Amino acid sequence: MNIVLDTNCLIMAISAQNEYYKVWQDFIDGKYILCITNDIIEEYTEVIARNLSPLISDYIITAILNRKNVRRISPTYAFHLIEADEDDNKFVDCAIIANAKYIVTHDHHFNILKQIPFRKVDIITLKKFLEEL
């Protein structure tokens, strides 16, 4: 299954002390396909470096980029579906183009997608995603 993982959810999943660590372990084990773009990788890098450390950021990004279950997407169109936080659109664009089953997020800005009769991308929390794994 193709998924897009919001940055805050990635940060929660990479901590071995967090209840969502299994999401990261299942990614490493190849149980789902993580869809990314260059913009998403840049955000992952910046936020992990700022919140944890540059060394951890390098380790995590290298781990992501070296996995076979990563699908790199090059969006050719920006849909601009989220107006409340334009920066979140990179995740939506990736999910639409990758035909992802889910965007895994806790960000309420993505809830607008539930009301758009456009190409349906389901929004799911880490807890619900973990239950599916």
Give residue spans per PLM region.
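Short N-terminal binding/cap micro-motifs at the start of the first secondary-structure element
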Residues: M12-I14
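Acidic, PIN/NYN-like endoribonuclease modules and their adjacent C-terminal/linker elements
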Residues: H108-L133
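A secondary-structure boundary/capping signal
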Residues: D6-T7, I36-T37, H106, L126
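Active-site neighborhoods of divalent-metal-dependent phosphate/nucleic-acid chemistry enzymes
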Residues: N69-I103, H108, I112
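Alpha-helix capping/helix-boundary segments
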Residues: C9-L10, I40, H109-F110
